[in-house]
From Swiss-Prot:
Keywords: Mitochondrion, Ribonucleoprotein, Ribosomal protein. It is found in: Mitochondrion. GO terms for molecular function: structural constituent of ribosome. GO terms for cellular component: mitochondrial inner membrane; mitochondrial ribosome; mitochondrial small ribosomal subunit; mitochondrion. Transmembrane segments: none annotated. It comes from Saccharomyces cerevisiae (strain ATCC 204508 / S288c). It comes from the Eukaryota. Signal peptide: none annotated. This is Small ribosomal subunit protein uS3m.
Length: 398
């Protein structure tokens, strides 16, 4: 609809020019004028969207408690799904791949699984039936392109407090970095070059060290599973709660979510208010045929969109999934020697809901200004002397 409206306006401009026998000698100026017209239309739509949202919020604030609010529906030009965080979208995936050949796509997927097992074996190397390292590795994240493959994984040093083992781990990781060509030593027999022959494209390996165990659910669940489950026969809840209190942050999820969402909301309001002021200022500028003056005024006003904001802090303020606001652990299986009976234990801390109306006066029917919950899930099964058990870890970042 918007494109049809734009085409109608442009066609009317062309008809007017033909009727008046106006010959445009500079086609570049004509094209840029059309672009300026399109930009003004976009600013006008943003202006209408902000006015609709402000009108809706004002009507909601004027309704007393217990009264039926008047719902104003926002059309397609409005904020679709009312998501607050639209500036920085992040996709969660383990493999990003596309091939025009279906057989090649299947082969690359099989190779990815084999490389995942290979890297896991290398990171958990054993000498003389003993682990020389206490490194926990996550699943690999494979990003394919036409001429390159980037393999990324996270790892955590589980024995960082032991100096002797820590020295072994440092030596082991230095050896791994050389093998994976992380240090750019240009070895012909490094793992990246070897894998390039199989994938027929350039391969890079990107290991990322985590400083905290709870930053990845895969590593977190493996860390819990590696602990001695036999010593918790008398009660897993108390013992594990004590262990988790030492490694997990003290969550103040209410204040973290409120400050983060309100901060992004203020950024959006300031940005749209500046855009509205920009539109009003452009409308007050006298229209003339001098394109250079009009273009200079427009560019000068575009730079004012981020007025009253510290632009250096905006990328960090809108960064998603940097705060842990909720975690839960579910143990299910034979965890104790109580007649071999299967039991289930749930540990929950924080919140898994990022809605703003939880602490604001906005009615629940609106559910505006929310961050989609990022639930990072992982299941891990293991066996102890009592039988098999399963650990399910769920993390929520904002």
């Amino acid at each position: 609809m918007k494109l049809k409206l734009l085409n109608m306006i442009l066609s009317m401009m062309n008809k007017t020019n033909n009727n008046n026998n106006i010959i445009i000698n500079n086609t570049l100026d004509s094209l840029m004028n059309k672009k300026l017209l399109l930009k003004n239309m976009l600013l006008d739509m943003n202006n209408k969207k902000m006015n609709n949202m402000k009108r809706m919020l004002n009507n909601n604030n004027m309704n007393p408690a217990g009264a039926n609010p008047v719902v104003h529906r926002i059309g397609p030009a409005g904020n679709i799904n009312n998501k607050l965080q639209h500036l920085n979208n992040m996709n969660n995936w383990n493999t990003q791949i596309y091939n025009y050949n279906k057989n090649m796509e299947i082969m690359n997927t099989m190779n990815d699984k084999l490389i995942n097992k290979l890297l896991y074996k290398m990171m958990t190397l054993k000498l003389n039936n003993m682990n020389i390292n206490k490194i926990i590795m996550s699943k690999t994240i494979n990003q394919h392109s036409l001429n390159k493959l980037n393999i990324k994984f996270y790892y955590y040093n589980n024995d960082i407090n032991n100096n002797n083992n820590n020295n072994n781990n440092n030596y082991y990781m230095n050896m791994m970095n050389k093998l994976m060509n992380i240090m750019n030593n240009n070895m012909n027999n490094n793992l990246c070059n070897i894998l390039s022959y199989y994938y027929k494209k350039k391969v890079t390996i990107e290991p990322i060290k985590l400083s905290y165990i709870y930053l990845n659910s895969d590593i977190f669940s493996k860390y819990i599973s590696l602990n001695d489950m036999d010593k918790y026969n008398n009660g897993i809840l108390t013992n594990y709660q004590r262990m988790l209190n030492n490694i997990m942050p003290k969550l103040n999820d209410h204040n973290i979510s409120m400050n983060y969402i309100n901060n992004i909301n203020n950024i959006n309001n300031n940005k749209y208010n500046n855009m509205i002021n920009l539109l009003n200022n452009n409308n007050n500028i006298n229209n003339n045929n001098n394109y250079n003056n009009n273009n200079n005024n427009y560019i000068g006003n575009i730079n004012n969109i981020y007025n009253n904001m510290t632009i250096d802090n905006i990328p960090m303020d809108i960064l998603m999934y940097k705060y842990l606001v909720g975690w839960s652990i579910k143990f299910k299986g034979r965890l104790s020697n109580n007649n071999g009976r299967t039991s289930t234990t749930n540990l929950l801390n924080g919140t898994f809901n990022n809605k703003k109306y939880l602490w604001s006066n906005i009615n629940n029917n609106y559910k505006l200004n929310y961050i989609p919950s990022n639930h990072n899930l992982y299941n891990n099964s293991n066996i102890n002397k009592n039988g098999k058990y399963n650990i399910k870890v769920k993390l929520n970042f904002i």
